[in-house]
């Protein structure tokens, strides 16, 4: 069993937001507060400590009361760059990640990921949901061993950026969540307005 104090939570808010017109998705208002704050309020009770990966508006994220770390790679290099800085700054054996634009993910997300990671002696546990009759992995909703940092850095230094290609190099377990709507995100302003 993995204790939550051995897990650091990371909110991934370092994207370019290109499908939302280039605006900072994590700072967009949802039910009276920024989406990243919703994510933080859901994630913080599930982990020992939390932090944010962001590449702009750092002061706004710092005002949420947790450490904020920008990518070490230039040009909005994608979620793996955020994972890398999270693993570099993580002081616990495990890192849990969630995106900033999904404000309703399950309150037992980390507990369930940790349970399966330990049970199956995996390196990475990822959430998976049923969509159109197919089980679909949600790789940015994951829990991983911080010992994977050298592997990720080598992968990024080779010029690769695809999260699925990196996770495929490790022992992964998918953890099925029945409520696919809990993982609904807002990639566009229209999707943000449609979130319940």
From Swiss-Prot:
It comes from Bordetella petrii (strain ATCC BAA-461 / DSM 12804 / CCUG 43448). It catalyses: Mo-molybdopterin + GTP + H(+) = Mo-molybdopterin guanine dinucleotide + diphosphate. GO terms for biological process: bis(molybdopterin guanine dinucleotide)molybdenum biosynthetic process. One of its GO terms (cellular component) is cytoplasm. Monomer. Keywords: Cytoplasm, GTP-binding, Magnesium, Metal-binding, Molybdenum cofactor biosynthesis, Nucleotide-binding, Transferase. It is an enzyme of class 2 (transferase). The keyword Nucleotide-binding applies. Pfam families: NTP_transf_3. This is Molybdenum cofactor guanylyltransferase. Mg(2+) binds at residue 101. The keyword Nucleotide-binding applies. It is found in: Cytoplasm. The N-terminal domain determines nucleotide recognition and specific binding, while the C-terminal domain determines the specific binding to the target protein. SUPFAM superfamilies: Nucleotide-diphospho-sugar transferases. Its cofactor is Mg(2+). Its EC number is 2.7.7.77. GO terms for molecular function: GTP binding; metal ion binding; molybdenum cofactor guanylyltransferase activity. Transfers a GMP moiety from GTP to Mo-molybdopterin (Mo-MPT) cofactor (Moco or molybdenum cofactor) to form Mo-molybdopterin guanine dinucleotide (Mo-MGD) cofactor. GTP binds at residues 12-14, 25, 53, 71, 101. Belongs to the MobA family.
